[in-house]
Swiss-Prot record:
The lineage of its organism: Eukaryota, Fungi, Dikarya, Ascomycota, Saccharomycotina. GO terms for biological process: establishment of protein localization to endoplasmic reticulum membrane; mitophagy; retrograde vesicle-mediated transport, Golgi to endoplasmic reticulum; tail-anchored membrane protein insertion into ER membrane. This is Golgi to ER traffic protein 1. It is found in: Endoplasmic reticulum membrane; Golgi apparatus membrane. It comes from Candida glabrata (strain ATCC 2001 / BCRC 20586 / JCM 3761 / NBRC 0622 / NRRL Y-65 / CBS 138) (Yeast). Residues 1, 127-177 are lumenal.
Length: 223
């Protein structure tokens, strides 16, 4: 395996691991960034205080300790407002951090992988024994990538303008084989098909909600 293929495989594996672990991202972010933030600490403190006051209200009688019960209710109303405001701030803070992490992923993974594919997209992963092993159109796409199909209409238009005959030339390519771009496309297609079959075999079927029967009238007709 060449270093070009090895780097491409590393990019694919890292991106797939991030995709498969999406459900755990919130837990990781919470433990790393959100749990010890000042807003989160204050939010948890207020929630515990509200829970304590609610338990205290349940343990006392509203008739025997009306003043205490009323004072606690006022505290609860104030705490509810503060908790709502802090919850909105915490949500905005979380979304801001997630946005920064998406930018980091874009700069460290997505953009470098795209640049790498543009740079080494025509790198031959598998060599073909000879030029005529497959149809010229297929061989051209495999060795030059999907851009080869986009260039064909331009070559056809050029041949019409110049009056020369149009032919798909593949013998002039320095190397004939499967390029890195096509190989990555095939690899991702195989992975997607495996994911689809796995989901079909092991995913739990979604049951339809049962219909509720309601009695809309109590009339009884007698023939």
């Amino acid at each position: 395996m060449s270093w070009v293929v090895a780097i491409a495989v590393v990019f694919v594996v890292v991106l797939k691991v991030l995709e498969y672990s999406t459900s755990y991202h919130d837990l990781v972010l919470q433990s790393l960034f959100f749990k010890n933030s000042p807003i989160s600490v204050k939010f948890e403190t207020l929630v515990k205080e509200r829970r304590s006051i609610q338990e205290e209200n349940k343990s006392i009688s509203a008739q025997d300790n009306y003043a205490k019960w009323t004072k606690n209710n006022r505290k609860l109303d104030k705490l509810d407002k503060e908790i709502t405001e802090l919850g909105a701030q915490l949500k905005a803070h979380n979304e801001q951090i997630k946005g920064h992490l998406k930018k980091v992923k874009l700069l460290l993974l997505t953009v470098p992988f795209l640049c790498f594919k543009l740079w080494k997209g025509k790198h031959i992963v598998y060599n073909l024994p000879h030029h005529q092993m497959f149809p010229q159109l297929v061989a051209g796409v495999w060795s030059q990538g999907w851009l080869y199909l986009a260039i064909l209409p331009l070559q056809l238009a050029k041949s019409i303008v110049t009056g020369s005959s149009f032919a798909i030339e593949t013998a002039s390519f320095p190397h004939m084989g499967v390029s890195l771009g096509i190989w990555l496309w095939a690899l991702n297609s195989v992975i997607s098909n495996i994911e689809f079959m796995t989901m079909q075999l092991w995913a739990k079927p979604v049951s339809k909600p049962s219909k509720k029967l309601e009695i809309v009238t109590d009339e009884i007709k007698v023939d």
